[in-house]
Amino acid sequence: MDALSQAISSGISVPYKNNSSSLVPSHGLTSLILRKSRSPVNPSSRSRVSVRASEIQHSKTSASSIDLSDPDWKLKYEKDFEQRFSIPHITDVLPDAEAIRSTFCLKMRSPTEDFVGGYPSDEEWHGYINNNDRVLLKVISYSSPTSAGAECLDHDCSWVEQWIHRAGPREKIYFRPEEVKAAIITCGGLCPGLNDVIRHIVITLEIYGVKNIVGIPFGYRGFSDKDLTEMPLSRKVVQNIHLSGGSLLGVSRGGPSVSEIVDSMEERGINMLFVLGGNGTHAGANAIHNECRKRKIKVAVVGVPKTIDNDILHMDKTFGFDTAVEEAQRAINSAYIEAHSAYHGIGVVKLMGRNSGFIAMQASLASGQVDICLIPEVPFNLHGPNGVLKHLKYLIETKGSAVICVAEGAGQNFLEKTNAKDASGNAVLGDFGVYIQQETKKYFKEISTPIDVKYIDPTYMIRAVRANASDGILCTVLGQNAVHGAFAGYSGITVGIINTHYAYLPITEVIAYPKSVDPNSRMWHRCLTSTGQPDFI
């Protein structure tokens, strides 16, 4: 594993707890949550069991020190939450950094060569965001811990407000546009909408007045590989890139050490870095941010979460997810037609989702043609009286065909572990889609029932397409707000949509662990209602 991957993967411990119903510390709520946990199929295979938010205590939280018998515990909780979700600012280490009037004004949508009076401004314009504006993180007030998906701070489910910083342009900025050299990188795998985000970061930077904008090719690797040169970017260069999938800048995993990256940034004069990537990439961005603070250099590092798995904490969704679901349901529809047209036809579709089954769940719901949906978060047996194969036999006998949708991370306990890692330090998964296809054929052969199995794996097809309209809008706003955050002097932050509003969060709060499907949630229950599948345990 390279030095950057080591920085990404270090420091986060995820203990496993198996409490049938207990109060346990939660990073997600920074306090105590009452949550019923399911027991795994095989207690010895803990590595396969997804860890819920209620089973994790983040190193920064002081939740365990909050005494619920204290009459002021709510106030203490709110202060603890506010402190943890405060967003880093360059004045934290550079208190003398000068704030100037913003150069961003919507009455001047296109950049001009000369600004009258120095910079465009309109004292009567009410388009700026106040630094004290907040967005509510949790919007449901649960009346009972038994409510579906309930996240309660105590046995009474007391309501406590959790506020995070609203995203958008500020009236005061901390960078002069003529002194800015902004760089954009895209890391990890492809995702619909990458070019859309790049495009609007560039356009918004130009509206602020920045003329020195570059793209770093192939992720963090572009900072150290001497054969790779930075790409000059402008509105003209990026004007139509959103019409294609992929990334104009290219992607890769891993990269050089954090110190090498910051050395390269200093040599190039980069003082704004926009990082598009998932949890691992954001961990790297946070390490870069910390190194810049350590050196006391004026640099804004801003992330834009990128993962079609939709496994970023706290956010409604990440860009590319809607497009991925839309493309995934096309594969499911094809599997249905193949299965329905064959005698005893069975369609098996494997979709992306290493640790979370959001794509499989949502695509199953969207298609309405899935009979069995298997995700990493929900334990299941293949064999036995309550197993998947027994139910599949029932479907063939009663319907004549069936469609199975599996997330790539599901069923890993049935496969042999290799302990192999990819360049980002992620475990290389076994192919459960192929495995369940083989087991299905074997099972029906043993019971002398002829079947016709069709296996579809659209993994790379669903992520290489251009963004749909919904994701296009999301990417546009995320790109704009990333630039607003950087000019406002924030660093070590990421931008996302939370309860339909856009907000800034400290990177540390979104990389603690991957978000996953809650088996007690209404959305998973809706999926079960759609498929009609039983519990396979």
Curated annotation (Swiss-Prot):
Ranges for region Disordered: 35-64
Tissues in which the UniProt entry reports expression: Expressed in roots, leaves, stems and flowers.
PTM sites of type Phosphoserine: 147
Biased amino acid composition, Low complexity: 39-54
Residues annotated to bind Mg(2+): 279
Main location: plastid
NCBIfam families: PRK06830.1 (NF005301)
Quaternary context: Homotetramer.
Protein's name in the database: ATP-dependent 6-phosphofructokinase 5, chloroplastic
Gene source species: Arabidopsis thaliana (Mouse-ear cress)
Upper classification of the organism: Eukaryota, Viridiplantae, Streptophyta, Embryophyta, Tracheophyta
